[in-house]
């Protein structure tokens, strides 16, 4: 298994698919990386040479924020929205949808599970 920017990539996958295992790299970026480093996207990770792995790693580190760096930036951005008290920040704080979706009947994922009702026994008279 090849290790690129701290992520173990499975040997049996094609390189373009394996690169999408890295947080911050999707299909488009994966193909862009391979095009600019001159590596065949259809090649398997197990067939990559050490030189090719270091090429990919260097290109990613020079051009993109990935993994922990990207996660912390996203977290900082959300924290900033909450601190300045804008509408989006308030929605994040309350755990509601941020991008204008309706919430009357949907948004169960964002709102979390419904509070369970406690059933009370009826007294027989």
UniProtKB/Swiss-Prot annotation:
Domain of life where this protein originates: Bacteria
GO cellular component: cytosol; small ribosomal subunit
A UniProt-annotated Pfam family: Ribosomal_S13
Record keyword RNA-binding present: yes
Gene Ontology process terms (BP): translation
Transmembrane segments: none
Chain intervals with Basic residues compositional bias: 101-125
Single GO MF descriptor: tRNA binding
Region of interest: Disordered: 97-125
Keywords per UniProt: Ribonucleoprotein, Ribosomal protein, RNA-binding, rRNA-binding, tRNA-binding
Function as written in the Swiss-Prot or TrEMBL entry: Located at the top of the head of the 30S subunit, it contacts several helices of the 16S rRNA. In the 70S ribosome it contacts the 23S rRNA (bridge B1a) and protein L5 of the 50S subunit (bridge B1b), connecting the 2 subunits; these bridges are implicated in subunit movement. Contacts the tRNAs in the A and P-sites.
Family matches, as HAMAP family: Ribosomal_uS13
Subunit structure: Part of the 30S ribosomal subunit. Forms a loose heterodimer with protein S19. Forms two bridges to the 50S subunit in the 70S ribosome.
Similarity annotation: Belongs to the universal ribosomal protein uS13 family.
Protein name in the entry: Small ribosomal subunit protein uS13
